[in-house]
């Protein structure tokens, strides 16, 4: 874990119900990362999307040339330096990424479709409406636009396939048992021996289905600023937000800018908030920092100085990557360079995801 409060983080990811909210409130009062950068309660709320819709933003293909930061980071170890490190060149193909985090409303609609149509998708966790809802219950008017939480990486893999089948047909499902066994993964609990089948998921990027972003895709979308050099550094042909700042912020993490773009423990009132209330980043993406941590596809690994194309992470690792910070944690956890990981069967009231897919 990259923070000095690593035990608190591990605890938070397993917290349930009122206990999580009480402890989060105490931490927010006692350990607020930067007391003067809370920002407003949120920028103007964007127009409400149509029922259950999920908007995507187009990301053009790019080649990113890694750069070593010449400015201070929240910590000294490599987990603060992101994936575009000095000596590494990353080529990304075009992709689409969700404008918002996946809401509980959308999550639940797919679960209901699965049940109503006997599609056979099996989840280890039913999901929760934000940080304080009832697991698996019907969405409420007040909380349906909050991010889904309490879902594991394995749940996300299976749900992505279910959503793909619902919207595009089962043939476009991304996550398969292996490159040679193209069985669609439908069961977050299934094992072969002692190994969960989902943990060996093969991502068929030739399909058009919904999926988790790779870590490189996530970070590029969080940091992209085009030719705008404000609070950014040139990485080859593109400017990327500095590693010590939140996504969309115009200054580093310990300034008021963090509170303008992110919900964290200094302004969240110890809970999640409806997606899209904070100012978007340069690509029009909301909540890339704060509100909930977001799962990525990759196994966590040390980043090597090499040339790679569309990297998907290591073949195995200590845990699956999650990025971005959350309502429960500190302003410095919202920085776009921070990397962390946890077991793929973990879940928490501050852990969710957003979607990606290849056009």
Over which residues does each language-model region extend?
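Surface-exposed recognition segments
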Residues: 88, 238, 248, 271, ...
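Short, flexible loop/turn elements at secondary-structure junctions
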Residues: 60-63, 96, 101, 152-155, ...
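Proline-centered structural pivot motif
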Residues: 115-123, 257, 261-263, 310-311, ...
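N-terminal secretory signal peptides that target proteins for export/translocation
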Residues: 1-13
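Structural recognition of the beta-strand scaffold that forms the well-ordered cores
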Residues: 57-58, 96-101, 147-150, 211-213, ...
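Short, compositionally biased
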Residues: 2, 21-114, 153-193, 223-229, ...
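Short, well-ordered junction/capping motifs at the entry into regular secondary structure
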Residues: 197-205, 253-289, 340-343
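Active-site microenvironments of metalloenzymes and redox enzymes
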Residues: 91-258, 301
């Amino acid at each position: 874990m990259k923070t000095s409060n690593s035990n608190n983080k591990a605890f938070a990811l397993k917290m349930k119900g009122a206990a999580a909210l009480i402890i989060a409130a105490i931490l927010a009062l006692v350990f607020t990362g930067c007391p003067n950068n809370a920002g407003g309660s949120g920028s103007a709320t964007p127009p409400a999307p149509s029922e259950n819709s999920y908007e995507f933003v187009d990301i053009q293909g790019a080649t990113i040339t890694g750069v070593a930061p010449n400015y201070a980071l929240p910590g000294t170890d490599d987990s603060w330096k992101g994936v575009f490190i000095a000596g590494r060149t990353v080529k990304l193909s075009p992709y689409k990424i969700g404008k918002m985090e996946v809401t509980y409303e959308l999550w639940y609609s797919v679960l209901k479709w699965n049940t109503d149509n006997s599609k056979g998708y099996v989840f280890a966790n039913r999901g929760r409406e934000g940080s304080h809802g009832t697991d698996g219950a019907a969405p409420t008017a007040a909380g349906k636009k909050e991010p889904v939480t309490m879902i594991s990486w394995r749940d996300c893999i299976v749900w992505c396939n279910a959503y793909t089948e619902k919207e595009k047909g089962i043939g476009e499902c991304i996550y398969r048992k292996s490159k040679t066994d193209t069985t669609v993964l439908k069961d977050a609990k299934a094992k072969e021996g002692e190994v969960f089948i989902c943990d060996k998921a093969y991502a068929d990027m030739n399909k058009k289905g919904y999926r988790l972003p790779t870590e490189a895709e996530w970070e590029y979308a969080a940091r992209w600023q085009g030719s705008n050099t404000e609070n950014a550094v040139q990485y080859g042909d593109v400017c990327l937000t500095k590693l010590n700042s939140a996504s969309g912020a115009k200054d580093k993490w310990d300034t008021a800018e963090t509170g303008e773009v992110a919900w964290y423990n200094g302004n969240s009132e110890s809970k999640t908030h409806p997606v899209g209330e904070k100012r978007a980043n340069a690509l029009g993406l909301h909540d890339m920092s704060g509100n909930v941590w977001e799962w990525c596809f990759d196994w966590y690994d040390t980043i090597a100085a090499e040339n790679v194309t569309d990297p998907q992470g290591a073949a195995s690792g200590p845990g699956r990557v999650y990025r971005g910070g959350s309502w429960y944690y500190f302003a410095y956890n919202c920085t776009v360079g921070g990397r962390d990981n946890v077991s793929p069967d973990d879940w928490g009231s501050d852990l969710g995801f957003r979607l990606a897919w290849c056009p």
